[in-house]
């Protein structure tokens, strides 16, 4: 089993696209990249901990590759926006691909370079690629939010879904 961590704005919106893939064993919402041990949602939202909302994915590489996950990741984000994603603004919503080893780093860097070279966007691809740091699972009510609260999820992700349809369909 392998592990991946991606930050792409509100973690509620990052779970479903990965969870629906064959070979995904689990997707957990949480926090990473900060200086407080085991932060709460309120602490992270205060922008005082340095964490970003992210998802941790455990996957079976015999069924889905890390490169596949990176491609899925791009299609959930606006990779030209470094100060949050869609309606969620600030460092705690910044787009980041976290890597666990040199192979993951190389895959992410090459994928980013390919996206930039494709001309798909007319602005620079600013998503950062950083070494993984401790991941802290978010509170239970944030896990699988899209299933537990479909109406609230739909309202909170409308701008994101419009962008994704316009730019990635």
Curated annotation (Swiss-Prot):
Q: Which superkingdom is the protein from?
A: Bacteria
Active site positions, chain numbering = 10
Keyword Oxidoreductase tagged: yes
Q: Name one GO biological process term.
A: protein modification process
Which InterPro entries does the record match to this protein?
Answer: Met_Sox_Rdtase_MsrA_dom, Met_Sox_Rdtase_MsrA_sf
Enzyme class at the top of the EC tree: oxidoreductase
Q: Which UniProt keywords apply?
A: Oxidoreductase
Cite the Pfam families for this sequence.
Answer: PMSR
The EC number on file is 1.8.4.11
Please give the Gene Ontology molecular function terms for this protein: L-methionine:thioredoxin-disulfide S-oxidoreductase activity; peptide-methionine (S)-S-oxide reductase activity
Catalytic activities:
L-methionyl-[protein] + [thioredoxin]-disulfide + H2O = L-methionyl-(S)-S-oxide-[protein] + [thioredoxin]-dithiol; [thioredoxin]-disulfide + L-methionine + H2O = L-methionine (S)-S-oxide + [thioredoxin]-dithiol
Q: Which HAMAP family match?
A: MsrA
Similarity field: Belongs to the MsrA Met sulfoxide reductase family.
Purpose of the protein: Has an important function as a repair enzyme for proteins that have been inactivated by oxidation. Catalyzes the reversible oxidation-reduction of methionine sulfoxide in proteins to methionine.
Q: Which PANTHER family match?
A: PEPTIDE METHIONINE SULFOXIDE REDUCTASE, PEPTIDE METHIONINE SULFOXIDE REDUCTASE MSRA 2
Its name, as the record gives it, is Peptide methionine sulfoxide reductase MsrA
């Amino acid at each position: 089993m392998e592990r991946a961590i991606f930050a792409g704005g509100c973690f509620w919106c990052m779970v479903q696209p990965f969870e629906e893939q064959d070979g995904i064993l689990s997707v957990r919402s949480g926090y990473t990249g900060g200086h407080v041990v085991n932060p709460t949602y309120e602490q992270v939202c205060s922008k005082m901990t340095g964490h970003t909302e992210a998802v941790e994915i455990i996957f079976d590489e015999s069924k889905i590759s890390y490169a596949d996950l990176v491609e899925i990741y791009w299609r959930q984000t606006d990779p030209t926006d470094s100060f949050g994603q869609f309606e969620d603004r600030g460092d705690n919503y910044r787009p980041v691909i976290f890597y666990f080893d040199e192979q993951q780093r190389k895959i992410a860097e090459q994928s980013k370079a390919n996206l930039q070279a494709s001309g798909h966007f007319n602005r620079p691809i600013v998503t950062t690629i950083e070494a993984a740091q401790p991941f802290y699972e978010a509170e239970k009510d944030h896990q699988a939010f899209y299933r537990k609260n479909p109406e609230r999820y739909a309202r909170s992700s409308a701008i994101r879904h419009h962008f994704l349809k316009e730019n990635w369909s």
